């Protein structure tokens, strides 16, 4: 009973923390940016089953946005070891499919191994029970709250590529602004430790040698003594050494290869799961509704359990953790000649309200343009998934702080209120944009419903020193709201 009360208290406390999390303000002058660059990863850490690449979080644009960015590649049968971070995370699946799990303290283990028939003379083996496992596929956005441990596994031939950000400016991060990943197992190199030590300034030769040793990394369990681990887990010394990672090769790293594949209790795929859910909903609709105390009326399944629920289990332990915004999803903005945009905010993906983050997937056809626009209440971290685009960014002084190409695999950070416009240079430019607000808003400067379109004609005329007819053209010539087709397409449409 005491254990149950503790769990409920923890869940209530966690729910409150997640729900009211916000962001700290960047330090003074961190957003006084005169020049932006399209950045590629500058650190690469190879493991047995894949690799992890990171961008330097000490770069000024990352400091301004208050985020850290990394990219993980998992080969066939590769398992990314469980870890948690000091800030909330968003993970976008650029390629591949597989399974992942999260471990919420206080939530029940609902996946249970089937009971095996016991042979005569054999001792019974405890059934494996664990928390829920989820499928993921290309285009999925995965929400990971602060301090929640998660793992990921690739059970297909195609390598999994996952891009993720950590919000280090979140108020849930009670440490400094440096991203930190806490691994539960292994002796892998910490992907952000290098930058943490660089931030400390120049070191002596002795200090550099010590840094190289520290960069070898380790898990949180490797720091405890054998005696403590034996006592805590009730295991012998040999198992305790394995918990420390003492008997492990240095080349395994944060991503290990599971020989023969991972055998766990996992959910059906999306295709297998869709039809049973539809049939169950149809059965619920066909059942009669009970009124009053009619004992002969058959109540719908789950009605009794629903009446006993207190809401905690639904808001934390069973919340939806992934949401697809890729090419296969229904776009929020669509122009057949220009492209499409799909967003994920806390309005359609409630888990994001705990992270205070959101994301946007966009696809632009060749020479199509996303009109000049700005984020009212968020920084934008734009990662190019495919193709290339010409992008211009302007700051508050009217200076072009970026005027160049954003190519596949590179990232461009656009601070809040900086104005950005993009035009695709390839047949299909695709990007994902992480935003530091769960309900981001954008304002467009051109096209229908834009700022200039909403101004009175005479205000435009006198503001820009134009003739009346010219002001009217600015207001009415572009009928598109966000995405503008190539100019030749517009000319053909007018003709």
From Swiss-Prot:
Motif residue range(s): Vacuolar targeting signal: 486-495
Post-translational changes noted in the entry: During soybean germination, seed storage proteins are hydrolyzed by protease/26S proteasome. The precursor is post-translationally processed to form a covalently linked A1a-Bx subunit complex.
Where would you find this protein in the cell? Endoplasmic reticulum; Protein storage vacuole
Here the segments flagged for biased composition (Basic and acidic residues) are 268-277, 287-297
The set of disulfide-linked cysteines is 31-64, 107-317
Q: Which InterPro entries match?
A: 11S_seedstore_CS, 11S_seedstore_pln, Cupin_1, RmlC-like_jellyroll, RmlC_Cupin_sf, Seed_Storage-Functional
Start and end residues of each Cupin type-1 domain: 36-241, 323-472
Gene3D superfamilies membership: Jelly Rolls
Signal peptide segment: 1-19
* Practical and industrial applications: Emulsification efficiency of glycinin is improved by degree-dependent glycation with soy soluble polysaccharide (SSPS) at 60 degrees Celsius in both the acidic (A) and basic (B) polypeptides as a result of subunit dissociation at the quaternary level. Thermal treatment of soybean seed proteins leads to the aggregation of glycinin acidic and basic polypeptides (GAP and GBP, respectively). GBP improve sensory properties of meat (e.g. pork) during chilled storage and inhibit bacterial growth (e.g. L.monocytogenes, B.subtilis, E.coli and S.enteritidis).
What this chain does, per the entry, is described as: Glycinin is the major seed storage protein of soybean. Glycinin basic peptides (GBPs), and, to a lower extent, glycinin exhibit antibacterial activity against Gram-negative and Gram-positive bacteria (e.g. L.monocytogenes, B.subtilis, E.coli and S.enteritidis) by forming pores and aggregating in transmembranes, leading to membrane permeability and, eventually, cell death.
Task: Output this protein's name.
Answer: Glycinin G1
State the organism's lineage. Eukaryota, Viridiplantae, Streptophyta, Embryophyta, Tracheophyta
């Amino acid at each position: 009973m005491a254990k149950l009360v503790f769990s409920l208290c923890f869940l209530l406390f966690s729910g409150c923390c997640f729900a009211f999390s916000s962001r700290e303000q960047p330090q003074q002058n961190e957003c006084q940016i005169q020049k932006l660059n399209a950045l590629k990863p500058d650190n690469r850490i190879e493991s047995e089953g894949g690799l992890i690449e990171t961008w330097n979080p000490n770069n000024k644009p990352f400091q301004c946005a208050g985020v850290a960015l990394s990219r993980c590649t998992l080969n066939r049968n590769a398992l990314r070891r469980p870890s948690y971070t000091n800030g909330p995370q968003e993970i976008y699946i650029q390629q591949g499919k597989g399974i992942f799990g999260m471990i919420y303290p206080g939530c029940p283990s609902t996946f249970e191994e089937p009971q095996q028939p016991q042979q005569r003379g054999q001792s019974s083996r405890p059934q494996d029970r664990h928390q829920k496992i989820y499928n993921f596929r290309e285009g999925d956005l995965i929400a990971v709250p602060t301090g929640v441990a998660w793992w990921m596994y690739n059970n297909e031939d195609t390598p999994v590529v996952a891009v993720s950000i950590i919000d280090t400016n979140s108020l849930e991060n009670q440490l400094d602004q440096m991203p930190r990943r806490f691994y539960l197992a292994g002796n892998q190199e910490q992907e952000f430790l290098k930058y943490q030590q660089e931030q400390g300034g120049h070191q002596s030769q002795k200090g550099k040698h010590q840094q190289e040793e520290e960069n070898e990394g380790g898990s949180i369990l490797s720091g405890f003594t054998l005696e403590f681990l034996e006592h805590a887990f009730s295991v012998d010394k040999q198992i305790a050494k394995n918990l420390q990672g003492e008997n492990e090769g240095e080349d395994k790293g944060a991503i290990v290869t599971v020989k023969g594949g991972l055998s766990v209790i996992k959910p059906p795929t999306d295709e297998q799961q869709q039809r049973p859910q539809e049939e169950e909903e149809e059965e619920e609709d066909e059942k009669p509704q009970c009124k009053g105390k009619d004992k002969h009326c058959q109540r719908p399944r789950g009605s009794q359990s629903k009446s006993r629920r207190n809401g905690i289990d639904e808001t934390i332990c069973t919340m939806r953790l992934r949401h697809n915004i890729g090419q296969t999803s229904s776009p929020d903005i669509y122009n057949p000649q220009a492209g499409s945009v799909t967003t994920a905010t806390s309005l359609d993906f409630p888990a994001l309200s705990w992270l205070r983050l959101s994301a946007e997937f966009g696809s632009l056809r060749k020479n199509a343009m996303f009109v000049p626009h700005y984020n009212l209440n968020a920084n934008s971290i734009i990662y190019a998934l495919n193709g290339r685009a010409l992008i211009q960014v302007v700051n508050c002084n009217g200076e072009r702080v970026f005027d160049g190409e954003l190519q596949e695999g590179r990232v461009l950070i656009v601070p809040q209120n900086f104005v950005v416009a993009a035009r695709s240079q390839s047949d299909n430019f695709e990007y994902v944009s992480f935003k530091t607000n769960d309900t981001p808003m954008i304002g467009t400067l051109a096209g229908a419903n834009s700022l200039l379109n909403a101004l009175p004609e005479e205000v435009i005329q006198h503001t820009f020193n134009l003739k009346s007819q010219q002001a009217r053209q600015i207001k009415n010539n572009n009928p598109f709201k966000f995405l503008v087709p190539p100019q030749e397409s517009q000319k053909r449409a007018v003709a």
